[in-house]
């Protein structure tokens, strides 16, 4: 397996390790991946949720690992809220998506979101979050962005992103603004294709500037190419990263997009070449896989992760030896990563909050955010629904097309939430229509056009129909429902808020879908 030459300089090895495996180096600087797996359920840059099955188990594993390393432990996680949450065990309270916060138009709520997520993460032993998303939303939505964005208005998104950074880092968890210089305007999913756009949308840099001014610890450089700036992907472009350093004044850690994804590294000739290009351009941490995997990894997958890290490690070493990459650049990057460890890493004497208290605070905040953000797009005058008619709840299956979407596994909370107010009968799409009257609630998460088609069937039968989008509000496009509701999230807090709005007499708030130019507003 490729790796360091036998006579590699130890100082340079340490620097490269910090760039390629910042969390793993702290976890186990001198032991093998196999030993690491036995000690902490971790290998190949991941903490597997097939071996660590609860926040308490994660906390124990990280605490145990910290006892044997000489400096603070730093492990990253994607815990954005909404559809992307690595910590998605059933006992973890989930916050609504960023687009919900944008709909509520309350930066204080975004700061609260950052604060309670920080509490949850620190209670589990994690101190680095790959959030917030600073990309601008577009319509039709981009698969890689969607509800992960705060909206399409640059100033509003900037206010939300800065507030989230203050909340998260005020809770002693490092924030990461992503995906610089902004994914708004791309038309393909960067997990599958190499996105190319001619220019940045107006105001695309404003959210990143606001995050930098708020003191964000890290910025993730995207894998997309903006031709007006450079013909190379952002993470490998000295000009794009220079814009971040020189124009925005960012002095923290620049992280690459996940280079393990073929669509990310193939345009540059492969994984090794992409890693060298990224560090040469100014990246400080080469991201390879996430720190916490979403599912089971077999031996072959773990071994592939080890090989990827070894390839990148050797590629950086060879690039320095061959004078394609300066040792000064390596040492500069390593110094920033060390500073991040000491600013946010988990020390052996760190006092961690109670999981129960942190999670309860997140549950309370989630409901507060949901109540401000659930949006009645059409039919406010119809609400609340009749107090005498029964309710038929029809769930439309999701398309399953979105990658990296933990919300798809969320329990179906809406029928139970509705049943707190009224007798509810659940039906499958295309089921025979029961006789009599009754309001029909057609709902789903990431349904595409299928929910609108199911809605049309019930409208044609003369029923009062409510369509609820539990994910991307694009699902409401073309709907003939009497009432359209954008909830932005399928989690419990949003489902309960929708039920109270439809049946419990809670008046619709001032929220509005924060994406301009949509066909259904």
Region spans (language model):
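Short glycine-enriched loops at secondary-structure junctions
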Residues: 24-26, 77-85, 89, 127-137, ...
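Hydrophobic faces of well-ordered beta-strands that scaffold small-molecule active sites
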Residues: 2, 14-24, 42-46, 73-81, ...
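Catalytic domains of carbohydrate-active enzymes, especially glycoside hydrolases
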Residues: 34-47, 115-128
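Surface-exposed, active-site-proximal loop segments in enzymatic domains
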Residues: 89-102, 139-150, 189-195
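Substrate-binding cleft of extracellular glycoside hydrolase catalytic domains
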Residues: 74-87, 94-110
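Preference for extracellular/luminal or secreted protein segments
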Residues: 1-38, 267-521
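A substrate-binding/cap region within the structured catalytic cores of diverse enzymes
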Residues: 102-126, 133-154, 161, 165, ...
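Second-shell residues forming the walls of enzyme active-site clefts
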Residues: 6-10, 28-31, 38, 51-73, ...
């Amino acid at each position: 397996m490729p790796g360091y030459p036998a006579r590699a300089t130890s100082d340079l090895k340490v620097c490269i390790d910090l760039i390629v495996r910042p969390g793993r180096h702290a976890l186990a600087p001198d032991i093998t991946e196999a030993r690491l797996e036995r000690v902490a359920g971790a290998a190949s840059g991941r903490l597997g949720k097939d071996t660590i099955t609860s926040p308490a188990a994660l906390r124990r594993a990280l605490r145990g690992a910290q006892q044997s390393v000489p400096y603070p432990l730093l492990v990253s996680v994607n815990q954005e809220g909404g559809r992307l949450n690595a910590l998605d065990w059933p006992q973890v309270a989930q916050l609504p998506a960023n687009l919900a916060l944008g709909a509520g138009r309350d930066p204080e709520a975004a700061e609260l979101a950052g604060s309670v997520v920080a509490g949850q993460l620190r209670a589990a032993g994690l101190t680095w979050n790959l959030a917030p998303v600073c990309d601008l939303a577009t319509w039709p939505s981009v698969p890689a962005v969607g509800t992960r964005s705060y909206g399409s208005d640059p100033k509003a998104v900037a206010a939300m992103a800065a507030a989230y950074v203050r909340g998260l880092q005020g809770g002693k968890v490092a924030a990461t603004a992503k995906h610089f210089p902004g994914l708004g305007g791309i038309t393909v999913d960067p997990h599958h294709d190499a996105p190319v756009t001619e220019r940045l949308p107006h105001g695309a840099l404003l959210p990143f500037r606001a995050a930098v001014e708020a003191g964000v610890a890290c910025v993730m450089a995207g894998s997309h190419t903006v031709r007006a700036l450079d013909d190379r992907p952002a993470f490998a472009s000295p000009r794009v990263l220079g814009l971040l350093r020189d124009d925005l004044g960012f002095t923290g850690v620049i992280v690459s997009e996940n280079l393990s994804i073929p669509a990310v590294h193939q345009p540059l000739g492969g994984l090794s070449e992409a890693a060298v290009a990224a560090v040469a351009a100014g990246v400080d941490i080469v991201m390879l896989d996430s720190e916490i995997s979403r599912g089971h990894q077999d031996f072959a997958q773990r071994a592939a992760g080890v090989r990827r890290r070894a390839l990148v490690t050797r590629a950086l070493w060879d690039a320095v030896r061959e004078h394609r990459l300066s040792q000064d650049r390596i040492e500069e990057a390593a110094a920033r990563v060390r500073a991040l460890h000491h600013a946010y890493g988990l020390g052996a004497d760190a006092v961690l909050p109670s999981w129960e208290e942190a999670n309860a605070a997140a549950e309370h905040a989630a409901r507060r955010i949901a109540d401000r953000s659930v949006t009645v797009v059409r039919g406010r005058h119809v609400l609340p629904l009749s107090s005498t008619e029964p309710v038929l709840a029809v769930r439309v299956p999701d398309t399953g097309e979105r990658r990296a979407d933990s919300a798809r596994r969320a329990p179906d909370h809406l029928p139970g939430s509705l049943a707190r107010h009224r007798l509810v009968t659940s039906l499958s799409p295309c089921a025979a229509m029961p006789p009599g009257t009754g309001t029909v609630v057609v709902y789903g998460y990431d349904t595409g056009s299928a929910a609108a088609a199911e809605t049309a069937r019930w409208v044609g039968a003369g029923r009062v129909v409510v369509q609820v989008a539990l994910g991307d509000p694009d699902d409401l496009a073309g709907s003939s429902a009497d009432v359209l509701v954008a909830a932005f999230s399928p989690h419990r807090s949003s489902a309960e808020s929708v039920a109270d709005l439809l049946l419990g007499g809670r008046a619709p708030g001032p929220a509005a879908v924060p994406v301009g130019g949509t066909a259904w507003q």
